[in-house]
């Protein structure tokens, strides 16, 4: 089968599905070139990125919306269900998910994402929104993963006076709160 690979900024529904199916899962830096590398040289069967780019083993290592559409159409026909029913089934089995991104103005350019991540990591609380921090990753900025699979990713631009913050929880209200925390954490000197 192969593993599932996705950009670090993409939501965790894919991760939860892979976990339940015992399929290896990994993340890569933001940018299709990084997940294409996983398809070409590292045994990925499927790769995805936040902007809707999906690629499949055995095809071109490029974002392929047509193949993705055809696979979804085949699934709809085989399951004899409409798309909203399939989405409802996914939510029932794997939980609701709300993913949002926010661009946050910074007072100065932060060309080194890793040093930013190290500084913020030192100041992290033990819990966020009432949930323990389970792990942190520094693949591309700083990703904070909570014990319940909620997460926050902070990626300074490196060339602009801004940081992209991405978050996923089970509701829009909680996701907005997570992005508000990113604003506070980004103020760390």
What does each model-identified segment do?
Residues 1-189:
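Phosphate-binding and adjacent anionic-ligand microenvironments
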């Amino acid at each position: 089968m192969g593993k599932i690979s996705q950009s670090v900024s993409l939501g965790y529904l894919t991760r939860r599905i892979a976990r339940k199916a015992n399929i290896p899962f990994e993340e890569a830096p933001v940018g299709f070139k990084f997940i294409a590398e996983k398809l070409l040289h590292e045994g990925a069967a499927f790769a995805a990125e936040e902007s809707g780019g999906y690629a499949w083993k055995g095809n071109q290592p490029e974002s392929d919306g047509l193949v993705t559409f055809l696979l979804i159409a085949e699934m709809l026909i085989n399951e004899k269900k409409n798309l909203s029913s399939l989405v409802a089934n996914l939510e029932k089995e794997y939980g609701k998910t709300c993913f949002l991104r926010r661009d946050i103005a910074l007072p100065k350019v932060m060309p080194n994402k890793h040093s930013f991540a190290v500084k913020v990591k030192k100041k992290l609380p033990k819990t966020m929104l009432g949930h323990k921090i389970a792990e942190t990753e520094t693949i591309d900025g700083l990703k904070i993963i909570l014990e319940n699979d909620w997460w926050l990713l902070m990626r300074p631009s490196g060339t602009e006076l801004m940081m992209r913050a991405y978050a996923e929880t089970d509701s829009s209200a909680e996701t907005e709160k997570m992005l508000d925390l990113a604003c506070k954490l980004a103020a760390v000197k």
